[in-house]
């Protein structure tokens, strides 16, 4: 990571997008107990600053993806929406009045922790609508899960595990979306993810169908649409952090400080 900067080079800083509190998800990623514990004591932004001598800003990866989505839209036409990003862990964000809404603690839009009733029991959305769930299914069936690292690949060869996972994702997303609408009447829900667009399109179509079968009495109508960026949304959102911090009238449009350089999020 260390390097010597040439005279004339201009760097605003380093933006980092990553899941928060990853030590809390050892069982979900099949890590041995305690294997991720060391991350508790690592200040990632401070370490990057130490090695690069550049200001480093850290954001939750799903929050960063939501910020990137917002930056690519006409805020006059898309001023309010709920955002889901399906990555290794599902996450998301909230946009209100054309700005990312971080909430009191910076953790607004933590959709992965939302309770959903799926398969006869209540559990968190993250346990259903995450790519790690599909990865576990592939490994259990003896298939190579490395294909999931390429969102541009053809995933049709995965077969039944993919179909089963997509059903599970759409069922849990439908429940989470309808529950969210009872709190804030978003006109639009945008769903994106690190997967082929064909897979995302099928998930969105099935989610719409499942929502149509749920009791939505008392809720205002809303639209469900695909995100505009795809798998790169998290990286683009992270790259935007130093620019937003230095060159916008409202540097907290995506940034919500928890420490000097850390951004909390969904």
Which positions does each model-derived feature cover?
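ATP-binding/phosphotransfer module of carbohydrate and carboxylate kinases, centering on a glycine-rich
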Residues: 1-12, 25, 50-53, 72-74, ...
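Phosphate-binding/catalytic loop of phosphoryl-transfer enzymes
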Residues: 10-121, 237, 241, 246-266
